[in-house]
Amino acid sequence: MNLAVQDVVKRPLITEKAERAREASRQYAFEVHRDATKIQVKQAVEKLFNVHVLDVRTAIARGKNKRVGRNVGRRPNWKKAYVTLKEGDTIALFEGT
């Protein structure tokens, strides 16, 4: 599936776990398109943020069951990617500058 670079990376994930990974080992977390491959994620991050990506790990987060009154629904599944950058590269979006 051919995805545009802007469609692959949906948003950054800013959680406590992601912050610890960023500080300890230069890993940044993103929510990505469900059909995106590791190669597409790598190319998109390199092009969007002008950095060098060493490794990409992906995981499918399962949607949770939610209730509103007596109606039960389900949130959709989504994919996240942990991207490891080359020594010295940073993404300013996460640094707050």
Swiss-Prot record:
Signal peptide: none
Entry keywords, A to Z: Ribonucleoprotein, Ribosomal protein, RNA-binding, rRNA-binding
InterPro entries according to UniProt: Nucleotide-bd_a/b_plait_sf, Ribosomal_uL23-like, Ribosomal_uL23/eL15/eS24_sf, Ribosomal_uL23_CS
Any one GO cellular component localisation term in the record: ribonucleoprotein complex
Subunit organization: Part of the 50S ribosomal subunit. Contacts protein L29, and trigger factor when it is bound to the ribosome.
HAMAP family hit by this protein: Ribosomal_uL23_B
Family listed: Belongs to the universal ribosomal protein uL23 family.
Protein name per the record: Large ribosomal subunit protein uL23
